[in-house]
From Swiss-Prot:
Keyword Repeat among record annotations: yes
Subcellular location: Cytoplasm
Subunit structure: Can form homodimer. Interacts with RLP24, RLP24A, RPL24B, EBP1 and JJJ1.
Alphabetical UniProt keywords: Cytoplasm, Metal-binding, Repeat, Ribosome biogenesis, Zinc, Zinc-finger
Transmembrane segments: none
Species of origin: Arabidopsis thaliana
Function: Pre-60S-associated factor involved in the cytoplasmic maturation of the 60S subunit. Involved in the dissociation and recycling of other late pre-60S factors before newly synthesized large ribosomal subunits enter translation. Can complement the growth defect of a yeast mutant lacking REI1. Required for leaf growth under cold temperature conditions.
Identification of the protein by name: Cytoplasmic 60S subunit biogenesis factor REI1 homolog 2
């Protein structure tokens, strides 16, 4: 025993020359790769059988493909094994028993090799030069016009997608998807079963748009109506509904939050009736004292005249639309919905409008809580003791 061996291949050697020759072999390299991967090595016989199988597959890939067709069934196969299985099938045996011996012949044909189309750079350059040499020119708009058209198309597509995907019914409950015939019944249902309360309902001018906006926030954006300062959406509609039900957040964060939160809902309210001066006269915003002339729709001319006391406007139109000008339909108002809900809130003893004292008291309490929290943190840092620890912490 010379004591020379290979640990990867489990083979002994008689001299150094044989060992060095083994280290240069493909078998030893293959076993080294398996050893690095944590897999045991293979014997030399198994490695040679594997190499022979790989070489045979390469030869088959290089050889031209053959088509084995059956004269009786008129079917073709690309491999001999599939053709042999077809010959043993019941359908082929039944047809062979009823047919004559002339048709029972296997036809073997050589398929033409596949042509691989390679894009040569010279051919590409030639085709490009031919295209450039053609005298077919098309006038195009400037870049600004193209960008404007693309932006308009994109906006129209976005509006269409929003309208299709998120068509919300304002008469449908936000919490249980129960549909009602009118918006009034829907708002009464949400207040009775879910505690939904609308602040300053006396000044609500658009109940339909108000409920549609809240429905988009809950059903599309998965955002809570009350604790949405950070606008962190939930994972699903059921998650945000469970959160609002458990926390009692089935209400609108309006009147007691910041200016940014109130600005979201200001367009649905109209506080002009509450602006009263000392003489009990309603105060309105005075416009610019400039006379204006506006054209609407290409068929009407509106002349507006502003003075110190009043604003007058006249409309000049075509005679063909006189039958429409004579009609005076009553303006559609949603005030009856607001009035019914206001009376319902008052019957239950709920304040529809917050008093100034309550708002001032709320701001003072909020400021006191902030100062108390800061002082407790400062005292805890100074004494190196954290006061608000869990009950299971004894120190």
């Amino acid at each position: 025993m010379s004591g020379l061996a290979c640990n990867s291949c489990n083979k002994d050697f008689e001299d150094d020359a044989e060992q060095k020759f083994h280290y240069k072999s493909e078998w030893h390299r293959y076993n080294l790769k398996r050893k690095i991967a944590g897999v045991p090595g293979v014997t030399e016989a198994l490695f040679e059988a594997r190499q022979a199988a790989i070489a045979q597959e390469k030869v088959k890939a290089v050889e031209a493909p053959m088509l084995y067709s059956c004269g009786i069934c008129n079917k073709g196969y690309r491999s001999s094994k599939a053709h042999e299985q077809h010959l043993k099938s019941k359908s082929h045996v039944l047809k062979a028993s009823t047919s004559t011996g002339e048709e029972d012949k296997a036809i073997i044909k050589q398929l033409p090799p596949r042509r691989v189309e390679k894009n040569n750079t010279a051919q590409l350059k030639g085709s490009i030069e031919e295209e450039e040499s053609e005298d077919e020119w098309i006038e195009v708009d400037s870049d600004e016009d193209l960008d404007a058209e693309m932006n308009e198309d994109g906006e129209e597509e976005d509006m269409d997608e929003d309208g299709i995907e998120f068509e919300l019914d304002p008469a449908c409950c936000l919490m249980c998807d129960k549909k009602h015939k009118t918006i009034e019944k829907c708002m009464v249902h949400m207040h009775k079963f879910h505690g939904f309360f609308i602040p300053d309902i006396e000044y609500l001018k658009d109940p339909k748009g108000f409920l549609t906006y809240l429905g988009l926030k809950v059903k599309r954006d998965f955002v809570c109506l009350y604790c949405n300062e950070l606008c962190h959406p939930f994972s699903s509609l059921e998650a945000v509904r469970k959160h609002m039900d458990a926390k009692g957040h089935c209400k609108v964060h309006y009147g007691d939050g910041g200016d940014e939160e109130d600005a979201e809902l200001e367009e649905f309210y109209d506080y002009s009736s509450s602006y009263v001066n000392g003489d009990e006269n309603q105060m309105v915003v005075s416009g610019e004292s400039v006379n204006t002339v506006e054209l609407f729709g290409g068929s009407e001319l509106v002349i507006t005249k502003r003075t110190d006391n009043k604003v007058t406007s006249r409309t000049l139109g075509s005679r063909e639309f006189m039958r429409y000008y004579k009609q005076k339909p009553a303006p559609s108002s949603q005030k009856h919905i607001v009035n019914s809900l206001t009376s319902r809130y008052k019957m239950m003893g709920l304040a529809t409008v917050q008093s100034k004292e309550a708002i001032v008291r709320m701001k003072v309490m909020r400021e006191m809580n902030k100062r108390g929290a800061k002082s407790s943190v400062r005292l805890g840092m100074k004494s190196n003791v954290i006061r608000n620890l869990p009950n299971n912490v004894t120190y």
